[in-house]
Amino acid sequence: MSIKEQTLMTPYLQFDRNQWAALRDSVPMTLSEDEIARLKGINEDLSLEEVAEIYLPLSRLLNFYISSNLRRQAVLEQFLGTNGQRIPYIISIAGSVAVGKSTTARVLQALLSRWPEHRRVELITTDGFLHPNQVLKERGLMKKKGFPESYDMHRLVKFVSDLKSGVPNVTAPVYSHLIYDVIPDGDKTVVQPDILILEGLNVLQSGMDYPHDPHHVFVSDFVDFSIYVDAPEDLLQTWYINRFLKFREGAFTDPDSYFHNYAKLTKEEAIKTAMTLWKEINWLNLKQNILPTRERASLILTKSANHVVEEVRLRK
């Protein structure tokens, strides 16, 4: 069955791995094995083959979209007789905890910045826009981190709105996973990038996801291209537990770590703790607030074992 026949009743074109890999065309590999190793997450296998077959075709597609967007901006400037401000192209990356959003974001940042146009690519995570722990404690939301009510959505929307309005210097708060909190006075300044990659659980959410805090403009209103990284729930749980175990032997051993006490757990205790955290917080957030946004994405990457992408769906 052809791609066209497969997708008559869906807004997406569906590609298996081989079909998608063929769309790389002649795009050269610009990352070395060592660079790829530095880009991968703590619990992920990221091979040269994965970058070549999945991310190079995606970077080629994005380059087409970005070039088209720049031409459209030039037409508007010609019509208005103005010299337009630099308006960044915004790419959002959503998906569950432990699915590998951050790795996808870092790989795309590296690839897009190495196209011949030498575009400047900034990467921001929405973790920085979580309310500080003090606020979450006051509101009884410490066990709801990552849920819609835990974010300062007004600040996040203002951040992307300012960027799209051409504001030259825009600041974003920075989150530390070591202290499990927003870093006080740790803002990062973003200076007119050509491309902004915005990575987070909530970047595809809209008004229906924020009944507790009604407002009329959302992050998704400013996004030019959105990606959802998907995987079966059993794999997500396994990846989350494995990541927790690696943190137990690594980051959690730091005395400054918010979760330092977890480093003292036995492996069996750590697995039990991770499963509880997954079921009571992360799985619940996935089912209620993250997975329902998947079909809003421009492109869906579906992973199988070992974080290997086996299917790509591209909105028509």
Curated annotation (Swiss-Prot):
Q: Where does ATP bind?
A: G95, S96, V97, A98, V99, G100, K101, S102
Where it sits in the cell: the answer is:
Cytoplasm
Q: Does the keyword Kinase apply?
A: yes
Q: Write down the superkingdom of origin.
A: Bacteria
**Record's InterPro entries?**
P-loop_NTPase, PanK, PRK/URK
Catalysed reactions listed for this entry? (R)-pantothenate + ATP = (R)-4'-phosphopantothenate + ADP + H(+)
The family note in this entry says: Belongs to the prokaryotic pantothenate kinase family.
- Tell me what this protein is called: Pantothenate kinase
Q: Name its species.
A: Shigella flexneri
The top of its lineage is: Bacteria, Pseudomonadati, Pseudomonadota, Gammaproteobacteria, Enterobacterales
